[in-house]
Amino acid sequence: MNKPVHNNEHRRKRFNKKCPFVSAGWKTIDYKDVETLKKFITERGKVLPRRITGVSSRFQGVLSQAIKRARHLGLLPFVGED
């Protein structure tokens, strides 16, 4: 009998992403560190999801609060720059 052929194109490769903040030993994220915050937002100014950045759930909440504070104080734009 013929064995079923598996289509490997549809399989996803799983990567173990480590949280960049945990691996660097960060305790908190500073809202004034704009260069770090810019790495976690899109060109349009949206916060990147955890599945893309690999940030832990604890730091994702802290990160989004820091981005919101920086936006409110005018350090980051609400909408991406053209």
From Swiss-Prot:
Gene Ontology CC entries for this record: cytosolic small ribosomal subunit
Key words, A-Z: Ribonucleoprotein, Ribosomal protein, RNA-binding, rRNA-binding
Molecular function (Gene Ontology), one example: small ribosomal subunit rRNA binding
InterPro entries: Ribosomal_bS18 (IPR001648), Ribosomal_bS18_CS (IPR018275), Ribosomal_bS18_sf (IPR036870)
UniProt cross-references to Pfam families, sorted A to Z: Ribosomal_S18 (PF01084)
Biological-process GO terms, alphabetical: translation
Protein family: Belongs to the bacterial ribosomal protein bS18 family.
Biological function: Binds as a heterodimer with protein bS6 to the central domain of the 16S rRNA, where it helps stabilize the platform of the 30S subunit.
Subunit architecture: Part of the 30S ribosomal subunit. Forms a tight heterodimer with protein bS6.
Entry protein name: Small ribosomal subunit protein bS18
